[in-house]
């Protein structure tokens, strides 16, 4: 019976009807006579053995099309069932076809491609495709979803081939669904005791700072209120460079960092914010996200970023702080299972290597192939010194220029990042382009091509439409140009 079905492409459940044990799954096996007959016998064969039926349906030799394959795989694996044979994911395909729309729900896609709302019938007559006899409203809606997936498959599969995205989809994106589903289920082990102790330490530090701030202010107030904090710092204490808005004084991090050495209270407030942020977001947030087995299980999102990078939610494990010693303590809370070790692996300067490859700049390629540190090599060229004479500060500035160029940084932004004048930053950039002329040519060419085509793409043909690059608005046009510079590199790296 399975052999008679294996040549068919089925629309697998695009939802589990909110039943984690999968008892609400309906499988629509199509509308053809042969398929319908096969489906009917198929269900009769496994009557009374729900798990056996699901394992047969989700075996590798039954080819299936679905929506949000990763999430369905996770549910199947979580219940000890097969999760094989998925040949197409309509959500993932729609994302590859247009990474900037942000509309990948089944109803949104159906409306977008067929210019009509997805109908949710309230009732259907019992048929050979229902496992449960009478068809409820929820089941009827499910039939509507499977029909929509079927229709979208017919549109999106040829579209990916038309856009030269099929190889990327079939060899990287779709196989990644299974990898991510297994990663989500595995989760990360966390040292709960250490996390609790860390949270208590943060509370003690924050409380001590709070009392110190009150003492320096001469009164108690809500430190977390920008309005009250602004009145204390700029109104009562008269600190300089205050910028008053319609809602009060600005007290964001940039403003306070510039005032850090004007008065001790400013440094105390910045420290207080660091402690309270670490406590609420990480010490407390991670504890709340921890499962009973001591592991945290995030959700990886494949259709969010415009460059193809993954994002992480519930909780976000991609923004664990590392820039401060205190923040780095959070990472130490993630521990391996007994008898295992955690391995931290990263590509070495992948975006700069891609810039060297895509631009074809011989000087930059030579710097990489020689095995020297690229930032030291850049500093030596930009500052006209021997590599052995490059100082830590020279390397730091060269590093900022290297990565800034990839993101289309301006002289003003670079000056802010490395603490020099705009004129100095401009001089660094001019020296950089004189050293790596191929990079300058690449930047000019890719922006011109994006303006002509209306899009940019990666080495794997992942595309991003750029209507902004033709905007009459300077800021919008500048944004489009920066994306044109960065997306081919960042997207290829992703």
Report residues per predicted region.
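Conserved "right-hand" nucleotidyltransferase catalytic core of DNA-directed polymerases
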Residues: 1-45, 58, 64-67, 109, ...
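Function-dense linear segments that define catalytic or interfacial modules
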Residues: 29, 104-120, 127, 141, ...
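Glycine- and acidic
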Residues: 54, 91, 132-138, 160-162, ...
């Amino acid at each position: 019976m399975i052999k008679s079905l294996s040549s068919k492409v089925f629309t697998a459940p695009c939802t589990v009807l909110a039943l984690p044990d999968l008892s609400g799954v309906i499988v629509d096996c199509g509308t053809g006579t042969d398929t319908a007959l096969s489906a009917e016998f198929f269900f009769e064969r496994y009557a009374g053995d729900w798990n056996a039926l699901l394992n047969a349906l989700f075996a590798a030799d039954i080819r299936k099309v679905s929506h949000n394959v990763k999430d369905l795989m996770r549910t199947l694996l979580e219940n000890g069932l097969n999760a094989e044979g998925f040949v197409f994911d309509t959500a993932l395909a729609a994302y590859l076809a247009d990474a900037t729309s942000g509309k990948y729900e089944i109803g949104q896609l159906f409306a977008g491609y067929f210019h009509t709302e997805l109908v949710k019938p309230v009732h259907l007559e019992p048929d050979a495709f229902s496992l449960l006899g009478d068809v409820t409203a929820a089941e009827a809606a499910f039939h509507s979803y499977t029909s929509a997936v079927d229709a979208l498959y017919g549109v999106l599969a040829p579209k990916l081939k038309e856009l030269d995205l099929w190889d990327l989809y079939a060899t990287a994106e779709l196989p990644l669904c299974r990898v991510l589903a297994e990663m989500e289920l595995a989760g990360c082990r966390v040292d709960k005791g250490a996390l609790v102790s860390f949270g208590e330490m943060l509370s003690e530090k924050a409380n001590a700072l709070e009392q110190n701030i009150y003492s320096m202010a001469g009164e108690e107030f809500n430190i977390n209120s920008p309005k009250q904090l602004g009145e204390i710092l700029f109104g009562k204490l008269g600190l300089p460079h205050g910028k008053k808005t319609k809602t009060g004084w600005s007290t964001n991090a940039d403003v306070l960092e510039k005032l850090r050495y004007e008065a001790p209270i400013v440094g105390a407030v910045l420290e207080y914010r660091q402690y309270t942020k670490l406590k609420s977001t990480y010490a407390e947030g991670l504890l709340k996200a921890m499962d009973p087995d001591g592991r945290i299980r995030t959700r990886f999102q494949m259709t969010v970023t415009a460059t193809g990078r993954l994002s992480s939610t519930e909780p976000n494990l991609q923004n664990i702080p590392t820039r401060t010693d205190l923040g780095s303590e959070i990472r130490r809370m993630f521990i391996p299972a007994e008898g295992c070790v955690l391995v931290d692996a990263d590509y070495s300067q992948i975006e700069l290597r891609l810039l060297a490859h895509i631009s074809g700049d011989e000087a930059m390629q030579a710097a990489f192939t020689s095995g020297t540190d690229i930032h030291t090599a850049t500093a030596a060229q930009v500052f006209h010194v021997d590599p052995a004479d490059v100082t830590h500060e020279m390397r730091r500035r060269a590093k900022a220029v290297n990565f800034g160029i990839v993101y289309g940084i301006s002289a003003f932004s670079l000056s802010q990042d490395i603490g020099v004048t705009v004129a100095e930053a401009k001089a660094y950039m001019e020296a950089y382009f004189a050293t790596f002329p191929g990079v300058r040519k690449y930047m000019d060419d890719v922006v011109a091509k994006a303006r002509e085509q209306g899009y940019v793409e990666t080495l794997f043909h992942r595309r991003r439409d750029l209507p902004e690059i033709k905007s009459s608005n300077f800021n919008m046009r500048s944004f489009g140009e920066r994306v044109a510079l960065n997306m081919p590199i960042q997207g290829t790296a992703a």
